[in-house]
Amino acid sequence: AALDGEGIATVAASVLATAGLANANTPVPSQFWSRLAGNTARHIQLTLAALLLAGVVGVSLALVLQPFARAASALLYVCGLLQTIPSIALLALMIPLVGIGVVPAVIALFLYALLPIVRATLTAINAIEPVYLTVADALGMTASERRRHVLVPLAMPHIIAGLRTAAVIAIGTATLAAFIGAGGLGQPIVTGLALNDTGLI
């Protein structure tokens, strides 16, 4: 049976929540999809912001430092070192620096997303045939023009592959961002664990 289009379970949960007899943090069925949509939107925002920053910074650093072997190796080493820090520890390290919320979460996700992008860009540029660079020099291209018109277009397939890998890392790690108040799909998990509410989880 249903009441005004609502199932009995929905009506009962709403009445209990209104009366303060049920956990207000556990969404009733009518609220489930709206909360899920909100958490999903925040999760996507965190991921896209981090990927955008990592893409711009990672590709730019790789392009600038690629001619210098030691600097490029140092960049890869630092990015790899960041990957060894546990996700929750890196998020916790952000708190004394920039507080809690979206900003520290985006910074942490950005740092995690750097390695695949930098590595893919450096690998792609190093694999470019020298003849293309020779032709660019013969045409009188400046260093910036050579990067923009030769290196980036030829390296783009590898860069996109690096971005895909970074996206997988960011999407997974963004779940933990809820522990520092950034929201996202990890929010109901964190709240459910804190309240010992398996229904919410």
Language-model features and meaning:
Residues 48, 111, 143-177:
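Transmembrane alpha-helices
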Residues 48-64:
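Internal alpha-helical transmembrane segments of multipass membrane proteins
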Residues 125-131, 135-155, 182:
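Short helix-to-coil transition segments within interhelical loops
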